[in-house]
Amino acid sequence: MSNRKPYVREMTRTWWKDDPFYRFYMVREATILPLIFFTICLTFGLGCLVKGPEAWAGWLSFMSNPIVVVLNILALLGSLFHAQTFFSMMPQVMPITIKGKKLDKTIIVLAQWAAVAAISLFVLVLV
């Protein structure tokens, strides 16, 4: 075994703030936090729906709290931001080739947003 001390580069807790690429990545990954709150609220809402009308009314009054509404709006914005970054990466990760020609990136991204809009409209009409 060697007596040499190996070089260990110092890593601060805020290392990601220095590089715009990593800062963007961390912001993108942080969008999960409001989504976790939204998912927990929906789970409790399903539980209240099963428990009966009084529990359901209590959950509805909780969901109408302005702080909860703001958190749900943040969750929606975070979800849309996450989807936009995911959709813009998709053509680079998995390029689609039709008859030997690569499909334009904007067509792929717009097709994904069209699918989101169609599914959202279908669910809106269904409910």
UniProtKB/Swiss-Prot annotation:
It is a multi-pass membrane protein. GO terms for cellular component: fumarate reductase complex; plasma membrane. Keywords: Cell inner membrane, Cell membrane, Membrane, Transmembrane, Transmembrane helix. The keyword Protein transport does not apply. It comes from the Bacteria. Pfam families: Fumarate_red_C. The chain crosses the membrane at residues 30-50, 67-87, 107-127. InterPro entries: Fumarate_red_C, SQR/QFR_C/D. One of its GO terms (molecular function) is succinate dehydrogenase activity. It is found in: Cell inner membrane. Its main location: membrane. SUPFAM superfamilies: Fumarate reductase respiratory complex transmembrane subunits. Part of an enzyme complex containing four subunits: a flavoprotein (FrdA), an iron-sulfur protein (FrdB), and two hydrophobic anchor proteins (FrdC and FrdD). Belongs to the FrdC family. Anchors the catalytic components of the fumarate reductase complex to the cell membrane, binds quinones. This is Fumarate reductase subunit C. It comes from Photobacterium profundum (strain SS9). The gene is frdC.
